[in-house]
Amino acid sequence: NKNWIYYYDNNNWMESYSQDIPSARYFHAMANDWNSDMIVMFGGYGLNDTGFYAYRNDTWIYYADRDLWLEISDAGGPAPRYQHAMAFDNITGDVILYGGYGMNETGYYQRFNDTWAFNIQTQKWNKIDTPINPGKRSYHKMAGDHGGNIMMFGGYIDGVGYDESTWRYREGNWTMVESTTHPEPLRYHAMKHDREHDLIVVFGGYKLSAPYYSDDTWVLDGTTGSWALIETNTTPIARYY
């Protein structure tokens, strides 16, 4: 459970020496507040307080300017889970969480179709009831743009399997985005916002067809919902996770 910091200005990684850090885990999710140096982390699968492996529902904030982790013990929030996705909402200033796989209130394991918003100021989670949603889903990824469009792609849906639909969350509502061109069904891909061009970039992932590892680069416009496959002169080797 080490913490590393990447510094853009000198292209260098440095190990953090924060004393109180989250326990070792995987398949957690994180999102950074664009207006500050804070990063919000929730959930994952790893050691709990009694030393057993379990789905986690703890919320942590990392203050990059102070190299400090702080657990928000009274944040409330989603049920224990992993394989969920989180993204920053540039309009509300909240961090939005959707879906994942874990344990519900009755102790049964399931995929989730719930939407939550973490308020940076109050440091509380609030459940968002939406008219429709992208289904009980895990392994998906999300990223937001300057206009407050939080885009979701890929993952695994109960009753459907691995998915290739694109969804937009905006102002408390989910809508499916129709596009004739888009990536094939993916899981374990990376999805991040290009702040300079205000576009969302997807790279890699695990496909349903051979060769199973992807090295494709896709760009998504959050406003129009249009996808474009980018041909680059050089590319990282195909990968997932």
Regions flagged by a language model, labelled:
Residues 1-241:
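Kelch-like beta-propeller repeat domains
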